[in-house]
Amino acid sequence: MIKERVTPPFQASGGSGVVMAESHIISSEAPPKSNPGLNIRTNCRMILNLLREKDCSVTFSPEQPLTPVTDLAVGFSNLSTFSGETPKRCLDLSNLGDETAPLPTESPDRMSSGKLESPKTQFVQFDGLFTPDLAWKAKKCPKRNMNSVLPHLLCSTPSFKKASGGQRSLSNKENEGELFKNPNCKPVALLLPQEVVDSQLSPTPENKVDISLDEDCEMNILGSPISADPPCLDGAHDDIKMQNLDGFADFFSVDEEEMENPPGAVGNLSCSMAILLSGPLLNQDVEISNVNNISLNRSRLYRSPSMPEKLDRPMLKRPVRPLNSETPVRVKRRRSTSSPLQPEEENCQPQRRGTSLKKTLSLCDVDISSVLDEDCGHRQLIGDFSKVYALPTVTGRHQDLRYITGETLAALMHGDFNSLVEKFFIIDCRYPYEYDGGHIKSAFNLHRQDEVTDYFLQQPLTPLMAQKRLIIIFHCEFSSERGPKMCRSLREEDRASNDYPSLYYPELYLLKGGYKDFFPEYKELCEPQSYCPMHHQDFREDLLKFRTKCKTSVGDRKRREPEFRLTGQRLG
């Protein structure tokens, strides 16, 4: 009986990536020597049966084997930096300690025994890039679909040495091994032009291979590209056609425009980085012409940092004022302040077309100066509006009262107005202790309102001559509070006792400055010639007592009689 020991049919030797199938027939008995060819065929059939039972793919096919460059192209079929997909596997850089790149080697069986004469049983491949399953599935993949699988970017390989005799032929096996084993220069660029790829990957007739690959096959990615500059190789490659590739036509029928202009901003970058770098740049410069097109009427609370600081914008919201500055508000104000007594010069102006409405006369249309002049004319008249004031008057603190100076009072006392005045009365409205401290000669001390009312209105006095007048003059210490109150009280009572405008005492006066200003200048007209102020230290109790009586008398009078106040009315 024959015992067989089958080694793994696809075993990599020395990390060179060469996969071969070995079979060793160990027999306890010597093999038959009659027909050695039949024995070999029998052994091969047994090996094939074992492989089929274990679902293993055959390493050889009736098609031509892969050349090193073809295997390299198939290995990088999944390497595409422009597809935007994440690589399925990263490059293992643990074996890259040496500067030389990993070199493809031939199978150990051929190197040792050399029994495999047919080129169909020999192919070269990188370790980790091609598995036996791929060769089995290659028949199922159509060649037409491989154009999308072909990478736009090839891995970096050593640059070829320039040959003195011209371009090296790939059919020369000695030169082929020399090209891949002894790189003497830096790695070349990754993105090869189309004609270079065609020239370097064109196989010889004896090494023609039909390659097909499934898009779903999992491939190991060696690494990322290094540069995008194409290498400079000697030789003319324009005469080489795509149909000479014999199996590579579908793979390398890449558009030249797509190869020259990568679909990204940078050819050796991924899709996301290419989109970022090839996108429109944001310009930070702002042109003034573009800014001027923006509406200037729009208010901006915050200025954008990218906008320039100085823009040709007006300072006001309305930079150009209208030519016609006559607004309805201004016209109304001008008409309200105009006088109706103005000359009719404005009528000469051309009238506006259309119906014009005439404004009714109101107090605002009357000139205020004419009203004041008219009032001044009435103010010169006495209380019953029958005559003018006999004594010269001055303005004082209270506009409704008539003031005279101390000089006028002294002249009246000296008899300078006897032709006009029949009799005059000087009423001292101060408290009794003030009156006793010093007062004007012939003055009456009446510090309460009821006393003044009883004295003048119970039995009214009349002048003996119609041309003569009765004059009453009020004063207090300063003629600021008590004297004006007493004067107004008498006028109110007099108005209440007569029909308007008749009065018993139409001519009332108030001494300006009071006794305080009159005493220093006319002491001879005062008796005793002294001055006692209201807030004297010796008369505090008297001050409180008289104030209380004055308030009580005023309250009683208001309760007895109805109150007739003429606040703000002219008293004459």
UniProtKB/Swiss-Prot annotation:
UniProt key word Cell cycle: yes
Pfam families tied to this protein: M-inducer_phosp (PF06617), Rhodanese (PF00581)
Keywords assigned by UniProt, alphabetized: Cell cycle, Cell division, Hydrolase, Mitosis, Protein phosphatase
Name listed for the protein in its UniProt record: M-phase inducer phosphatase 3
Highest taxon listed in the record's lineage: Eukaryota
Catalytic activity, reaction form: O-phospho-L-tyrosyl-[protein] + H2O = L-tyrosyl-[protein] + phosphate
Family: Belongs to the MPI phosphatase family.
Function noted in UniProt: This protein functions as a dosage-dependent inducer in mitotic control. It is a tyrosine protein phosphatase required for progression of the cell cycle. It may directly dephosphorylate p34(cdc2) and activate the p34(cdc2) kinase activity.
Keyword match NADP: no
EC annotation from Swiss-Prot or TrEMBL: 3.1.3.48
InterPro entries documented for this protein: MPI_Phosphatase, Rhodanese-like_dom, Rhodanese-like_dom_sf
